[in-house]
Amino acid sequence: MVTANSTVKVGNVTFSNSAPLALIAGPCQMETRDHAFEMAGRLKEMTDKLGIGLVYKSSFDKANRTSLKAARGIGLEKALEVFSDLKKEYGFPVLTDIHTEEQCAAVAPVVDVLQIPAFLCRQTDLLIAAARTGRVVNVKKGQFLAPWDMKNVLAKITESGNPNVLATERGVSFGYNTLVSDMRALPIMAGLGAPVIFDATHSVQQPGGQGGSTGGQREFVETLARAAVAVGVAGFFIETHEDPDNAPSDGPNMVPIDKMPALLEKLMAFDRIAKAL
């Protein structure tokens, strides 16, 4: 039986619960080619300076927007062209989320990490299709799942022949329009064998909290991230934007990109202490 690898390599980036922190970061959705290059360039520069491995993320389609009228992204075909060019320009691996089995085969030749959205984390056919591409699969734990329930989710991928899987904690539903982060989930999920990622920005979401869109409390991103790094994680998932208040999606919980270097410095310092104990 194939089991999850405790160390997962994505290009030159290593994810392991006992290795130095790695980062998955980028804007919520891919807005334009120029915007993608602006964000990628700034993230590449800061992560090179800080010495932290970067996987650049962005979504070609936000398929689960609160409102039918909400912006969803530039689409699969255009996004794949941009991802390919970003990889050539900056040399980092890239991640995007997929929503159907058919998208897996289309995305895999370009994208290094296929991400399973939290709402879809139990969709067996989608998990199998993602696994069979041979790419690293990052599964967001559903807001409705207990951390130990991820055992069966991860098994659907590993038993399809792919041991390279990441498990991401992004909060659990707590009443209406509210998520909470139970830090016990991190060691529980680590006990399942896969590297654990903490999604510090979606964890402060207020789903549907603005009526026609999702709200958030970005002022608590650092609070939760510091707690998570003290417990111990393989990496962080952080969405960022140069002007979150005017971003087309998830603005209320994205970190302003000019605040990212200071945040990462703190998290890396705490990570060194936590993993030295």
UniProtKB/Swiss-Prot annotation:
Organism: Brucella abortus (strain 2308)
Pathway, per record: Carbohydrate biosynthesis; 3-deoxy-D-manno-octulosonate biosynthesis; 3-deoxy-D-manno-octulosonate from D-ribulose 5-phosphate: step 2/3; Bacterial outer membrane biogenesis; lipopolysaccharide biosynthesis
Protein's gene: kdsA
GO CC terms: cytoplasm
Entry's Gene Ontology BP terms: keto-3-deoxy-D-manno-octulosonic acid biosynthetic process
Family per record: Belongs to the KdsA family.
Domain of life, source organism: Bacteria
InterPro entries (UniProt xref): Aldolase_TIM, DAHP1/KDSA, KDO8P_synthase
Pfam families per UniProt: DAHP_synth_1
Name of the protein: 2-dehydro-3-deoxyphosphooctonate aldolase
Subcellular location: Cytoplasm
One of the record's GO molecular function terms: 3-deoxy-8-phosphooctulonate synthase activity
Catalytic activity: D-arabinose 5-phosphate + phosphoenolpyruvate + H2O = 3-deoxy-alpha-D-manno-2-octulosonate-8-phosphate + phosphate
EC number(s) reported in the record: 2.5.1.55
